[in-house]
Amino acid sequence: MATAIGLAIYFAERNRGAYHNLFMTFSQKPEFVSLRGETLLQKIKYVERTEWGMNTNFQAAFERVLETALDHDVLPEEMPKALIVVSDMEIDRCGDRNWMFYDHMKEKYEYCGYQLPNIIFWNVDSRNDIFHADSRRKGVQLYSGQSVTTFQNLLNNIDSTPVKSMEKVIESERYACVRTGNAA
């Protein structure tokens, strides 16, 4: 939970425009919450006291993002690039197995002149192998762990597919010795 709280604060402070200082609750009826507090400790205490429904409704989450955009006349370039779900991944099923809700939301966003944000599942617990999408699902990414490298990879690949994100990591300088067989 500490990781999720820290990341909620981190991303809320960096959101732009109508989404600045906002984070979304995990809930059947997700809501944006405005980050409050002057110091980091005050912000942590505030987030800890936030109501969490402890279940998920991703379609409703995407609808909240779109409603906020429409209510505040958000320009397309100011829309969030992704919904980042920081969790132990023991969360409700994402709509149906075929992700029909995601396809429906994509159409709804496009009708309103926006691109649907990616959804990034970030398993910060790493104790299970639950996957909420397969590697071919465009607009969905899967991350696991709490390392700085994981965080950097997420930020560098925020609008990518799972396979493209993986390829970018594998093709990075860090793994050159593995690719060439020149391990020290």
Features from the language model and the residues they span:
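Acidic, glycine-rich A-domain
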Residues: 1-184
